[in-house]
Regions:
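Membrane-embedded alpha-helical segments of multi-pass transporters/permeases
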Residues: 38-42, 83, 87, 153, ...
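Transmembrane helix-loop-helix hairpins at lipid-water interfaces of multipass membrane proteins
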Residues: 23-81, 161-166, 277-281
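ABC-type nucleotide-binding domain
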Residues: 330-331, 337-586
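Membrane-integrated ABC transporters
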Residues: 1-37, 52-67, 85-89, 93, ...
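Short intracellular "coupling" helices and adjacent cytoplasmic loop segments at the cytosolic face
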Residues: 2-3, 94, 102-126, 130-132, ...
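Helix-loop-helix
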Residues: 54-55, 60, 159-173, 243-316, ...
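An intracellular "coupling" helix at the cytosolic face of ABC transporter transmembrane type-1 domains
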Residues: 17-18, 113-114, 130-139, 143, ...
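Alpha-helical segments in transporter systems
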Residues: 21-46, 67, 71, 86-90, ...
């Protein structure tokens, strides 16, 4: 994609809009601070010469005091300039990172479901949190420093060569030889910082995966194997962090050694020049200050470039995420559903998650208004895929899906989503009160309706046993069984009161008694709604108006339970095998 080929600077520009003035003021404050830093030693030189010339007669105390007072004033101004540029740079960088986070949040909502199916949650979360934070912290620590130090080095060079080219040459050559040596290390550090961010994402993803599946890991006695895998990933992260931080940490001591070496050379060469009468003592004193001023920003530049490389690696991952292909823009689609009856028609639908592999083949079926339609079949038959297409989570490759005669391709995704209530196999409840969970993103839901829906699915009594009833906050202190969580999600779907209903494995994780309660409530409350039920337990869908039997992405049988049993085909074999298994279990 074009965005991925763009430079980081070009990709960053939209997020810097409106911050240019603050950055300009920070830049000017940096220039002022550097001018003061460079100008100070020239006045110190004058002060030293005044004192040295007055040793044989008398020191001009008034002149020395005037220079001292002047230096105090300009150094205070320099201090304020430093604070101003640091404040403005920090503010701009934090605003930049805030905009990045906002862009990522908007991006998540515009990505197709296929992206999340193909990427681990840990990797995505690492880009949203760790990478943005790393970029912000690294930029905050280095951007102002590198800019200020670069300008300072330039100003010091001009001043030193204007004062004495011999001492200036000694300072520059001795310092740059060491800096060239350091640049070799910096060239290798970029790859290590990139590996650090990737390895951190891998560790986050693995921890999230093992935490969410902790019960399975424990039941299979796989704790030791997961420890070994984590140890491998953790050691890889340790290795990449160690390498990047070792190179980062060694630069400052090297540059300090170079600074001290240059300092000694300036004193030796300066003393020789002074003995020959070529320079004054004041120039030596000034150059002693300039050596420190010159070598320190070079050290800071080396350290800052390392941080910028770390920021570059992190921002590269963030912009890679922001450049992912989004869902189709549907702002031009205006078809809406009104006075819905609930008829759904699949007309020769074909679909594949990848272009080279078709999952659903020429699928056709009709669900009349108010019917209960069950979709059954072995694992991998395409049942859940049909629901994903029905909800427009994915775009179909061929054919059409029509709701009350309107092709879903002509409607916005939000319009299709509003037409459905949905209970997924994966239970999702957020940290908030039970009431907030039940009326999620819906307005005008009264407490009476909340209680009515809860009673309909048999969860009201349990809720009232909790200390705060419907105001109980669902967090780590509240323990709910899988069945209770599922009942809450079913009540939430019922409160939405949409004309179409999808139940994906809705009762597969509850006990028999709870399943019976749910089934009775569903049968009563699904009246007048077109319902699609996916269940591996065929006993739960015997009263369906239409059963679609799928295998390898095709409908191989359809009819009601009695008709399909009379055919003695694939459905009958599935049903009889489950019935036999249930008897054996009993």
């Amino acid at each position: 994609m074009e965005n991925k080929k763009m430079s980081l600077w070009k990709q960053s520009k939209p997020y810097l809009a409106g911050l240019q003035f603050a950055l300009l003021i920070a830049f000017l404050a940096t220039i002022l601070s550097n001018i003061i830093t460079v100008y100070g030693p020239t006045r110190i030189k004058e002060m030293t010469n005044i004192i040295a010339s007055g040793l044989e007669t008398s020191v001009d105390v008034a002149a020395v005091a005037a220079i001292g007072a002047f230096l105090a004033v300009i150094y205070v101004i320099g201090l304020l300039s430093n604070y101003l540029q640091a404040f403005l740079f920090t503010t701009a960088i934090q605003r930049f990172s805030e905009r990045l986070r906002r862009a990522i949040a908007e991006k998540i909502n515009s990505l197709p479901l296929g992206y999340f199916d193909g990427h681990s949650q840990g990797d995505t979360l690492s880009r949203v949190t760790n990478d943005v934070d790393t970029a912000a912290q690294s930029l905050n620590q280095s951007l102002g420093t590198v800019l200020s130090s670069s300008l300072l080095v330039l100003a010091v060079l001009v001043t030193m060569f204007g004062m004495n080219w011999i001492l200036a040459l000694v300072t520059v050559v001795s310092t740059l030889v060491g800096f060239a040596f350091v640049s070799v290390f910096m060239g290798k550090s970029q790859g290590f910082f990139k590996s650090q961010q990737q390895d951190l994402a891998a560790v986050n993803g693995y921890v999230e995966e093992m935490y969410s599946g902790h019960n399975v890991v424990t039941s299979y006695n796989a704790i030791e194997s997961t420890k070994e895998e984590f140890a491998t990933l953790n050691h890889r992260l340790y290795d990449s962090i160690w390498k990047s931080q070792f190179i980062s940490g060694i630069m400052m001591p090297i540059m300090m050694f170079i600074g001290n070496f240059s300092y000694a050379l300036v004193i030796i060469v300066g003393a020789a020049l002074a003995l020959n009468g070529q320079i004054s003592i004041g120039i030596i004193v000034a150059f002693m200050a300039y050596v420190r001023i010159f070598s320190q920003p070079l050290s800071q530049i080396a350290q800052g470039i390392t941080s910028l490389q770390q920021a570059s690696a992190a921002m590269g991952r963030v912009f890679e995420f922001l450049a992912e292909e989004e869902m189709e823009d549907e702002s031009h689609k205006e078809r809406q559903l009104s006075d819905m009856k609930g008829q759904v028609v699949f007309d020769r639908v074909s679909f594949g998650y990848t272009p080279d592999r078709t999952i659903i083949h020429d699928f056709s079926a009709t669900a009349h208004a108010g019917q209960k339609v069950a979709i059954v079949g072995p694992t991998g038959a395409g049942k859940t895929t049909i629901v994903n297409l029905l909800m427009k989570f994915y775009e179909i490759d061929k054919g059409s899906i029509r709701i009350d005669g309107i092709d879903t391709k002509e409607m916005k995704r939000s319009e299709v989503h509003d037409a459905f209530s949905m209970v997924l196999q994966d239970i999702w409840l957020f940290e908030g009160t039970i009431r907030d969970n039940l009326i999620y993103n819906q307005e005008g839901i009264s407490d009476e309706r909340v209680i009515e829906a809860s009673k309909a699915v048999g969860i009201h009594h349990f809720i009232m046993t909790l200390p705060d009833g419907y105001d109980t906050v669902l967090d780590d202190t509240v323990t709910l069984s899988v069945g209770q969580k599922q009942l809450l999600t079913i009540a939430r779907a019922l409160l939405k009161d949409a004309p179409l209903l999808i139940l994906d494995e809705a009762t597969s994780s509850v006990d028999t008694r709870t399943e019976e309660l749910i089934q009775k409530a569903m049968d009563r409350l699904m009246e007048g709604r077109t319902s699609f039920v996916i269940a591996h337990r065929l006993s739960t869908i015997r009263n369906a108006d239409l059963i679609l039997v799928m295998k390898d992405g095709n409908i191989i049988e359809q009819g009601n339970h009695d008709e399909l049993m009379a055919q003695a085909g694939f459905y009958a074999d599935l049903y009889n095998s489950q019935f036999t298994e249930d008897e054996v279990e009993e």
